């Protein structure tokens, strides 16, 4: 999985699609980082910095993962995370965002893993479009993959307009998953991303 925005930027075509999808770029998806791409990236960076200043910063891992999201999702993730950190701390836990954007290639590699950890191939997950993040519950360095805190923290999505929580899904409950509810389904998000 992309560990930072720098990892996302290595796939130049994917990065241009992210910039276009987020509304910063209207040039060709050609993998050439010319004047338009650079200006779009600078605008993204400026907005991301403003969002950080307004909504605060978190631990290094969370910051790396938030940075991979489109700025609108970064804002939502920061609002959710501020409250989640407070609530987790009251119960003796830590919360970190452990995954943000994944390229299609990274999604396919995750799909191929056994045991199966996702039902989505590349282009079939909101993570592929910078709209989704997963969180983890910790005590110090100890990760809890299964904890009642996932339900407690996941329900905080209600405090953030336009965010949905995977814990409310009927067919595939995904308690660590939150996403910006900008598109009615993954197919619509993919169509917008690839247009």
Question: In which residue ranges do the predicted regions lie?
Answer:
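Generic non-transmembrane alpha-helical segments
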Residues: 18, 22, 80-91, 152-163
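Second-shell loop/turn segments in exported
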Residues: 2-6, 26-29, 66-76, 139-146
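Short acidic, glycine/serine/threonine-rich helix-capping segments at coil-helix boundaries
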Residues: 3-13, 17-59
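Extended, low-complexity, intrinsically disordered C-terminal regulatory tails
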Residues: 85-115
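Surface-exposed patches in mature extracellular/periplasmic domains of secreted proteins
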Residues: 27-30, 92-102, 162-172
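Short, conserved phosphate/pyrophosphate- and ester-handling motifs at nucleotide-, phospho-/glycolipid
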Residues: 34, 103, 127
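Active-site acidic/histidine clusters and adjacent loop/turn architecture
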Residues: 57-96
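Catalytic cores and adjacent binding grooves of peptidoglycan-active enzymes
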Residues: 120-195
């Amino acid at each position: 999985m992309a560990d930072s925005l720098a990892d996302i930027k290595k796939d130049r075509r994917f990065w241009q699609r992210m910039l276009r999808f987020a509304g910063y770029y209207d040039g060709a998806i050609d993998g050439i980082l010319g004047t338009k791409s650079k200006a779009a990236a600078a605008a993204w960076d400026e907005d991301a910095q403003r969002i950080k200043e307004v909504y605060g910063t978190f631990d290094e891992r969370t910051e790396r993962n938030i940075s991979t999201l489109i700025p609108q999702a970064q804002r939502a993730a920061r609002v959710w995370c501020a409250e989640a950190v407070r609530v987790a701390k009251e119960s003796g836990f830590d919360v970190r965002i452990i995954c943000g954007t994944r390229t299609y290639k990274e999604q396919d590699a995750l799909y191929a893993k056994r045991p199966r950890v996702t039902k989505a191939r590349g282009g079939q997950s909101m993570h592929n479009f910078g709209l989704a993040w997963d969180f983890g519950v910790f005590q110090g360095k100890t990760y809890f993959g299964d904890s009642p805190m996932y339900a407690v923290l996941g329900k905080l999505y209600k405090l953030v307009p336009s965010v949905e929580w995977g814990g409310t899904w009927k067919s595939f409950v995904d308690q660590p998953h939150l996403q910006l509810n900008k598109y009615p389904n993954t197919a619509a998000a993919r169509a917008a991303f690839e247009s």
